[in-house]
Amino acid sequence: MSKQSITTAKATAIKRILAFVYDLFLIIPLMMLAALIWLPFNNGVAIEPGNPLYPFMISTTAILTPILFYTYFWYKGGQTLGMRSWKLRIVNLSGTPLSSKQSATRAVLLILSLTLIAVGFNTAFALNFTVQAIIPLGLALISLFGMCQTFAKRRTSLVDLLTQTRIVQLPKVEKPKK
């Protein structure tokens, strides 16, 4: 396939989601390792829920770890390990690799979207899906809608539109026959 056909081949939403799930198997252990950074701040003992540092530690680790993970992989090669498994790559609209600014912005927007989804659904569940749950559930659904390939004729996600990027499907590489 030529460069033009690679950059125009659209990645399906299912493959994007599956690549994200694969990435979670890397991000969750990385978050556990990142939590070790906080041990010296508590005399080498794990920080437990009653500790005043606990909310700060949890939120900082949960937000920064995936942002750094995605920024690094998207900047270095346009692919995370999950994306590589599904032959997906993130490129500029011109088909070139992402800049560090685009990678970081895209990672922050992804984590922000996921946070809105989580907060919205958690609040809706806590309110037993009553009338008061309409606003948080609506925010969650809007964020989820924005992550999907639903905008414009090109079916790009909101994150793609804001960062001037897109996820493309790479061609299947033929293995040489022996």
Predicted regions and their residues:
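Membrane-interfacial and juxtamembrane segments of integral membrane proteins
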Residues: 1-178
